[in-house]
Amino acid sequence: MADSEEQEDYKIQGFDADIQNLLKTALKEPGSVDLEKAANVIVDQSLRDSTFSREAGRMCYTIIQVESKQTGCTMFRSSLLNRLQVEYRNRKETRARSLQEWVCYVGFMCNVFDYLRVNNMPMLALVNPVYDCLFDLVQPDSLKKEVEVDCLVLQLHRVGEQLEKMNCQRMDELFSQLRDGFLLQGGLSSLTQLLLLEMIEYRAAGWSMTDAAQKYYYSEVSD
């Protein structure tokens, strides 16, 4: 029963049996499996599956915590960060190849940033790479693609406040570009304009939204 709950909890039922066993063991006894392989499996699936990428940060956090507690090692975290660094360096090629893979990567990076902690603080090593990805998403070409705007808004809702606390200057620069795109760039869809305006007001209100504003924006989106 516990296995089936865990499988469902972390949405690993789509993997073949060997990979499911690898991940389930990594979650319980990480010292007994190939953690570099486990990290690569999680990243590979996160780049293909946006639903899984939203879960994966929590899974990575669990494996890191259990490994630290049981063995005192950080093999999984090192393997994960090494692989994320490779994907970060290749992000332009990823975007050119597949927008879906690109937004999955950004979502996964932000999810890992959201969950991973060192001394109860976000990992400094991830702050600038996450910012760089968000800056990519406010470029004029990206603002013309609703899938990228959706990703930008979703990730800023998730980690914007944390990122600002880690580096306020870069958040100011990001929102300066976002505002310029909203005010000056032609050819944006009405949905994109609505989402960008909502995000500008969301940050201006201290990363929060009144009930009235939420009803307004989301009734407009649903229309």
Curated annotation (Swiss-Prot):
Spell out the InterPro entries in the cross-references. ARM-type_fold (IPR016024), MIF4G-like_typ-3 (IPR003890), mRNA_TranslReg/HistoneTransl (IPR051367)
Q: What does the similarity note say?
A: Belongs to the MIF4GD family.
Alphabetized, the UniProt keywords read:
Cytoplasm, Nucleus, Translation regulation
Q: Matching Gene3D superfamilies, A to Z?
A: 1.25.40.180
Which is an annotated GO molecular function term of this record? RNA binding
Provide the Gene Ontology terms for cellular component. cytoplasm; cytosol; histone mRNA stem-loop binding complex; nucleus
What Gene Ontology terms for biological process does this UniProt record contain? cap-dependent translational initiation; regulation of translational initiation
What is this protein's name? Answer: MIF4G domain-containing protein B
Locate the MIF4G domain: which residues? 9-206
What is the annotated role of this protein in its UniProt record?
Functions in replication-dependent translation of histone mRNAs which differ from other eukaryotic mRNAs in that they do not end with a poly-A tail but a stem-loop. May participate in circularizing those mRNAs specifically enhancing their translation.
Q: Where in the cell is it found?
A: Cytoplasm; Nucleus
Main subcellular location of this protein, as a coarse class: cytoplasm
Q: How does it assemble?
A: Interacts with eif4g1, eif4g2 and slbp; probably tethered by SLBP to the 3'-end of mRNAs ending with the histone stem-loop, it also interacts with eif4g1 which is bound to their 5'-end.
